[in-house]
């Protein structure tokens, strides 16, 4: 299926100089896959070749592709003529509740990706913290309340239909007002699980105890800049900044925050650490 699908693309765009070269590529690819010398990612298995081999087109699902002839972005007219073969996507989210690109729209965009077996990661640092003022009056319910909605949405979707669950990464900058709650999110949920298990509920991951609590459908990471480590070395205070106006909402000891990150990672394997400054220093396409 995969080999034939790739062969169709090779013929369509004349990637090889001769038919013999194309046949050699096909034969070597099929041999390599059958002997597990190389295998593609999961979405390739799920999606690629369904149209070419079985004639399955599927309804359009809001995907886009770049036409190689015109170099223009076009909306896909079916699900599998231009399938979703990539394993990982990065989505942004605006500090907006219901408009396109905002929080509720993100769950729809994630669902589209999960449906075809791919994973998604998002940095949620743009969303204002609990208690920050809203433009229409009142104050924000905070980031954590929305993360729990996204967690439930991801848990309701088994990526790829019947093959795998949603793959989801949640990132947060270390100066977000709710960083401490985020760091300890899974720690607190694991305490609830332990209490439920002690009360007689099964301990397996698909059991009622884990289905009851939140935070079980993503891997979480904190974005750590170099200036945090400088503050840590100096045993200084770390400022948590409002997303709406940049003011300092709270000050915590850098060492205390670092200790909580390490304890949480030991206790429940989250959050991971992403070294923001170093990652961007090594960025090969900083203007991209």
How would you label these PLM feature ranges?
Residues 1-288:
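Extended catalytic cores of very large enzyme megasubunits
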